């Protein structure tokens, strides 16, 4: 992975995703081969310690780890344990809470927050340690639509700030927004590349065989093409799908404008005349 890149890891339960994350974080040593993160190898205890200082790991349901009386105290826990000066701890706490949009909540009890806010507060505690690599294990699992939208916005903001991100996800829509996608099946990589490459027609059989689908916008586009619509390209996000459909909508409007006068109540496009009276008396 390149610095500042976002990589999505997808696969069915039991495919090896969480094990791969633990290897990346230095929580486990590889049985064979090497794992190198930010210049340190995880083959030795010293190397794994070095990796753990560079990697922030947000496990599933991190909000369950909240414990302090205030959000500020909870987010400060990690930086304080690093032995940083109080002023630096305060700076990091404020910066992390601003990143997740909870700057106004730092004096609140974390248990007064909504479910989505609790997760953001827990993530802020990891961000306050300023990791070079942020590892997210199913960050949107269990959240309502608003919470998922906020989390996706946070990931986009972190990428804009140059944070390198690895996220495990079951959401093909989240994977489609990454720079790089790795597909695992039974602890083996079966596809690896950009979202466009991984979700190409050539890989459709592989994905189906391991129980994975396509991002919904791309799936809709291919269904429309198979039904006779013009080629729509490979829209991976809802925004790209809307852009691809725009010209078709314009063509439909133009065809309507070139047809019969809309004031004419006669048949149009071969459809039968309506049997509904134009006016109904009181």
Q: Where on the chain are the PLM-derived regions?
A:
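Helix-to-loop junction immediately C-terminal to a conserved catalytic motif
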Residues: 25
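ABC ATPase C-loop
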Residues: 102, 121, 126-127
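ABC ATPase NBD Q-loop/coupling interface
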Residues: 34-50
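Conserved ABC ATPase "signature" region
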Residues: 87-105
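Catalytic Walker B motif of ABC-type/P-loop ATPase nucleotide-binding domains
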Residues: 134-137
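A short, proline-enriched helix->beta-strand linker immediately N-terminal to the Walker B motif
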Residues: 128-132
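Conserved ABC ATPase signature
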Residues: 109-113, 117
